[in-house]
Structures are given as C-alpha cells and as structure tokens.
From Swiss-Prot:
Protein's name in the database: Large ribosomal subunit protein uL10
Keyword presence, Nucleus: no
Similarity comment: Belongs to the universal ribosomal protein uL10 family.
Quaternary structure, from the entry: Part of the ribosomal stalk of the 50S ribosomal subunit. The N-terminus interacts with L11 and the large rRNA to form the base of the stalk. The C-terminus forms an elongated spine to which L12 dimers bind in a sequential fashion forming a multimeric L10(L12)X complex.
GO molecular function ontology, one term from the record: large ribosomal subunit rRNA binding
A Gene Ontology term for the protein's cellular component: large ribosomal subunit
Gene: rplJ
Keyword Endoplasmic reticulum part of the UniProt annotation: no
GO biological process, one term: translation
Classification via InterPro entries: Ribosomal_uL10, Ribosomal_uL10-like_sf, Ribosomal_uL10_bac, Ribosomal_uL10_bac_type, Ribosomal_uL10_CS_bac
Amino acid sequence: MLRRPEKEQLVQELTSEFQNSSLVLFTDFKGLTVAQMTNLRRALREKLGSGARLTVVKNTLLKMALKNSGYDVDSHESSFFGPTAVLYVTEGDPVEAIKVFYNFVKENKGTPVCKGLFLERKFFAGEQLEDLSKLPSRDQLIAMVVGGIQAPIRGLVNSLAGVLRSVLYALNAIKEQKEKQ
C-alpha cells in the first residue's frame, strides 16, 4: 500500500501525463491474467510505441489526477468503481489505441470491460467503444481530406485542359483548311 507522499507523487505524475493525453480510457481488469495484461501492453507498444501506457490505479487517485488535469469527472462518477486500469495516449493516434483495445476485448470474449473514456477531453461511455473503434485513423482522415480538396481542383484542371484541347483542335482544323486552299 502506498503512503501519502507516494500517492501525492503518483497523482502529480498522472496529472502531467493526462494534461498531454489525447485518450484516457479506464477499464475493469477483473478476470485478466498477468499474461493477458502483458499481451495488451505489448500490442499497444507495437502500434503506438512509448506513446501509450496501461497502468493500474486506485479510483480515488485516478479521479484526483483527472480533475487536476481539467477533465469533467464529477458528471461521470458512476464510471469509477471496482478495480481500474487506465490506458492513456500521450503521442500517436488515439483511435489506433482504441482499435487495439477493442480487438483485445473481442479476442478475450468481452474482457476487460471498458468503463468509459475521454477522447480529446470529451467523455464517451464504455458502450460506445465499438463505434469509436470503427472511426478512421488520423492518417486515413488526412488522406480523405486531401482527396476531397484535390478532387474539385483535378476536375477544374481537366475542364480547362478540355477547353484548351478544343481550341487547339479548332485551330488545327482552320490551319488544315487554309493549307488545302
């Protein structure tokens, strides 16, 4: 059991981590073996490197750290119960972490249960995890935006090129007519 100074130190560390986090997901890890927790950590590390961490935290300390970081914890008090592990992402794509976690839950037949999460500081209930896992990744979104911007420009270029081709064909036709005369 941690002593008060150690708890204060932990809250300070978590507060600084949560202030820079794009995702804070809390889950009930009951029913997971150490090997399964290690596999989840490994999968997160493979996808996000050192930008994602999964750690077990006491609910009161977790709530303090989230409050200190500016998260709206009071409205979602019911999400903080029982044994809790927290997954947070400080760098990298938070949607990738959600996908890794969701796939892990599917592989382990619904364990662990997501209690709730903050994605870009907006709260989502644990039941929304599947929907969030279907979101496109950051890179896919950027590609979609670039494609959306590029399509009208490409269409304009093709239209202008078509007009220029028509003028060129007309000029060539006039040139050929004059050469025949």
